[in-house]
Swiss-Prot record:
Lineage: Bacteria, Pseudomonadati, Spirochaetota, Spirochaetia, Spirochaetales
Residues that coordinate or bind ATP: G608, P609, N610, M611, A612, G613, K614, S615
Primary gene name: mutS
PROSITE patterns the record matches: DNA_MISMATCH_REPAIR_2 (PS00486)
Highest taxon, organism lineage: Bacteria
Protein name according to UniProt: DNA mismatch repair protein MutS
Length: 862
């Protein structure tokens, strides 16, 4: 086909060969056109009209509305290569064209494509010579970081993939083939690079060139330990796709695992920290409850805090001090929250300016933010709030940026640079606006000089501006007048000044636009010189917005300050589940509960029926512990919490069909991970471990797990189960808890309140009844349960009424019905008698009760 195509299509095909994995937006006039397979695919995804020209499938989108179409393609995890017309053709062939950028989900910087409260991460994973590392970058916020995996590579990588939720991942071919299935990488957009691209010497050279350094040690790397290969993969990827848009990246954050609480991928999911497990939105997550921040920067920092709880007590207490200050000074808190509404996302704006992707409003937003910055400083001084980490030099730098923008950038919609900022620009603007005025002024000066009272300046399309002099005044024509045309009754003249004035007037509009842009770019360059302190301002706003938010929520929700210790306790009084309480506050009052764990008593077994609140209680303890470690007040009247290095939460499981793993195997994998990695300072949450296999196997496994935790790990643990036999475990660290149940006749009331004793019944049949199972099924279950009570043996089936397989099942069941009814009547009578309190009835009441029993027996006998 290529032999018969037009020169433009041949040009398209040549460019497309270089960007096979991207949709090529090929600029043709005022449209971006797509051809061949791109056109077919995009027309379906975006519901565009697919046409054909010379048998070539094609579709297109207007240039001025292209952003929306690109945004939609990015949401489909597509890469988009933008091919622009580079210049006019001089050879008679097609216009020169080149790809100016490749937009992919992981390298978005356009605010229209970004979510305000979520970082947009591109991740690279390297296993070069078994030096495992994980690097991440958010171009929109200029954040670049790396994790070294010196041990526990696989579990840490799973954790970080869940934590960072990257939009795009770069891996080597070898890594992809080895780990794609194990890590379920198909859920991400993957860029595979040939393994031979992972070259240590090229990586060192590339990183040194980007950061303009002599050696990698200044960045914190040992060149003999090539963890930095993942950084190289990121830099190389962005250079290849976005040309020179790495100018905003000037440092690398090297993350230290030991500073943060470990939350594996399963725990992040089970606790629903930043997204729920239904539609994966933030609603019903801990993040949604704690997020009442007013700035995009504060929202992103909250997400970072939740996923990275800290372990340093001093640092936690500093945060808590700030939260307490704003909780107590609520009028200041309200004022700040109202003020922060006026702050735009300057963290991302500063990055765009560094990458030369700025527009006028970006500078106006910075000006507004810096104005708020100085307002906040005055408020802090007034209220004696001592958190201020800017020195005099930095404050002066911030002032310079503010006054530069304030004096230069116009807020008027039809003006870029303010009048008065640059005299030359003002003159150009005046010339553009007052052209006729300047012509008249010059005409008047020449009239006075020549004394030709009827001297005129006229204009034609062919000759432009000229003086017109009538015959009677020829003798008075000044010597600097140059004749340009003679007519019958007059002559036309030009002067050097008139020619210059005409040129200036004709060029004024273009000159204003060009000179304004020159000044604008110069202002941007000046602002970039202060980028470090401006980023510090952005970080300041993010932190203050967050602790103000925490203080506001503490006051509003009656959260209390937790006390963090170096011990092993988790002591909570009147504690509540923050998420459940938040989303049910308008319909019910949340039942408060205690938690009493210490170094002597650290393992809690929780028994009781489904629906009684066991799972809520488990998550509640984990979430409150985590909240304390991020510096938030907690939903409890009192909280004393020992520093917790890891939280493990194994609640519920489902089949992993993709890996061929059953529910039970998934459960055992998760449990194995906990037993391998938990320490004495960890918190373990387990719910229904062992339920996915036979009763005896499940009970044995659960018992052995508890024994292992008690004897070897000694971690603080909450273990919910329906294996009531486990409550007989005898160990000094063991605590039996259960959920209170209140009987009301044949009904049960779940009080959702914890008490220190084991439950002896799971009330499963009752739960099945209120869930709506058919009455016949419920009756049958009661019969079977009664037949099982007190029995012993290898199989419960030997005690059950048999059902044949010869087609007579229904008849047998029908014949059994009377027996079932009689047994139920017997059980009802037994229940009636067992509820009589003989110590608290009068003689008359006893006779009445005896009469009721006789009547029931007669009724059942008839």
């Amino acid at each position: 086909m290529e032999k018969n195509v037009t020169p433009m299509i041949r040009q398209y095909l040549d460019i497309k060969k270089k960007y096979k994995d991207a949709v090529l937006f090929f600029r043709v006039g005022s449209f971006y056109e797509m051809f061949f397979d791109d056109a077919i695919e995009v027309s379906k995804l975006l519901n565009l009209t697919l046409t054909k020209r010379e048998n070539v499938p094609m579709c297109g989108v207007p240039y001025h509305t292209s952003k929306e179409y690109i945004r939609k393609l990015i949401l489909f995890d597509k890469k988009v290569a933008i091919c622009e017309q580079a210049s006019n053709s001089t050879s008679g062939g097609p216009l020169e064209r080149e790809v100016v950028e490749v937009i992919t989900p992981g390298v978005i910087i356009d605010e229209d494509f970004l979510n305000d409260d979520i970082n947009n991460y591109l991740v690279a994973i390297s296993d070069y010579k078994d030096y495992y590392s994980f690097s991440y970058i958010d171009l929109s916020t200029s954040s670049l970081g790396i994790m070294f995996y010196e041990n526990g590579f696989f579990e840490k990588l799973k954790r970080d993939l869940e934590k960072y939720s990257p939009k795009e991942i770069i891996v080597s071919e070898n890594f992809y083939y080895e780990y794609s299935e194990k890590l379920n990488l198909s859920r991400f957009l993957i860029n595979r690079v040939p393994t031979w691209h992972l070259d240590k010497d090229i990586a060192i050279k590339t990183i040194k060139e980007h950061f303009n350094i002599l050696g990698l040690s200044s960045l914190g790397f040992d060149e003999e330990k090539p963890y930095y290969i993942s950084i190289f993969l990121i830099i190389n990827h962005i250079k290849n796709n976005l040309k020179n848009l790495l100018s905003n990246i000037d440092k690398i954050d090297i993350n230290n695992d030991s500073s943060y609480m470990f939350l594996d991928d399963v725990t992040q999911v089970n606790l629903e920290l930043v997204k729920n497990n239904n539609d994966f939105s933030s609603q019903y997550s801990l993040y949604s409850v704690l997020n009442d921040c007013k700035t995009a920067m504060g929202k992103r920092l909250l997400r970072e805090f939740i996923l990275n709880p800290i372990l340093n007590i001093s640092e936690i207490n500093t945060r808590l001090d700030h939260v307490e200050f704003f909780c107590k000074n609520i009028s200041l808190t309200v004022t700040l929250r109202e003020t922060f509404i006026n702050i735009w996302d300057i963290e991302r704006i500063i990055s765009r300016i560094q990458m030369k992707r700025y527009i006028k409003k970006d500078f106006l937003f910075i000006e507004k933010a810096l104005s708020v910055f100085f307002t906040v400083k005055k408020l802090f001084d007034k209220h004696n709030f001592d958190y201020w980490n800017f020195d005099k030099f930095e404050e002066d730098s911030i002032s310079k940026v503010y006054f530069l923008i304030n004096s230069a950038i116009s807020s008027a919609p039809d003006e870029l640079i303010k009048r008065g900022y640059d005299l030359k620009l003002d003159n150009l603007k005046d010339l553009k606006i007052n052209a006729n005025k300047y012509i008249d002024q010059y005409l008047e000066s020449e009239r006075l000089l020549s004394k030709i009272n009827n001297l005129k300046i006229r204009k034609t399309n062919n000759r432009g501006l000229f003086f017109e002099v009538t015959k009677s005044n020829y003798a008075q024509v000044p010597p600097h007048f140059m004749e340009s045309q003679a007519l019958n009754s007059s002559k036309r003249y030009k002067t050097e000044k008139l020619i210059s004035l005409e040129v200036d007037i004709n060029n004024a509009e273009d000159n204003v636009v060009a000179f304004e842009q020159e000044i604008f770019d110069e202002i941007a360059s000046n602002v970039v010189m202060h980028n470090k302190v401006l980023k510090k301002v952005a970080e300041f706003f993010a932190y203050i917005d967050l602790v103000v938010n925490f203080g506001y929520l503490a006051k509003k929700n009656e959260y209390k300050r937790p006390v963090l210790t170096s011990g092993k306790e988790i002591l909570l009084e009147k504690s509540r589940h923050p998420v459940v309480e938040h989303y049910t506050k308008n319909t019910e009052i949340f039942t408060e509960n205690f938690v009493r764990i210490n170094k002597e008593k650290y393992f809690c077994l929780i028994t009781g029926p489904n629906m009684a609140g066991k799972s809520t209680y488990l998550r509640q303890v984990a979430l409150i512990t985590l909240m304390a470690h991020i510096g938030s007040f907690v939903p409890a009247s009192k909280a004393l919490i020992g520093i917790t290095d890891k939280i493990f939460c194994r609640i519920g499981a489902s089949d992993n069909i993709a890996k061929g793993e059953s529910t039970f195997l998934v459960e055992m994998n998760e449990t194995a991970n906990i037993l391998r990695n938990a320490t004495e300072k960890s918190l373990i949450i387990m719910d229904e471990v062992g339920r996915g296999t036979s009763t005896n196997d499940g009970l044995a496994i659960a018992y052995s797990i508890i024994e292992y935790i008690l004897e070897y790990i000694k971690a603080r643990s909450l273990f919910a189960t329906h294996f009531h036999e486990l409550s007989s475990i005898n160990h000094q660290a063991f605590i039996n808890l259960s959920m209170k149940i209140e009987k009301q006749g044949n009904d049960l009331v779940f009080l959702r309140e914890v008490e220190e004793k084991p439950s002896l019944n799971s009330y499963g049949i009752y739960v099945a009844r209120i869930a709506g199972l058919p009455l016949r099924v419920i009756d049958r279950a009661n019969v079977i349960l009664e037949s099982l009570v007190g029995r012993e043996g290898n199989s419960c089936l030997e005690f059950l009424p048999h059902v044949s397989s010869d087609g007579n099942d229904k008849e047998i069941l029908k014949n059994d019905t009377d027996i079932h009814i009689k047994l139920n009547e017997y059980l009802e009578l037994k229940n009636f008698i067992s509820n009589i309190d003989i110590n608290n009835i009068t003689p008359f009441q006893s006779i009445e009760l005896l009469n009721q029993i006789v009547l029931k027996v007669i009724s059942q006998s008839s």
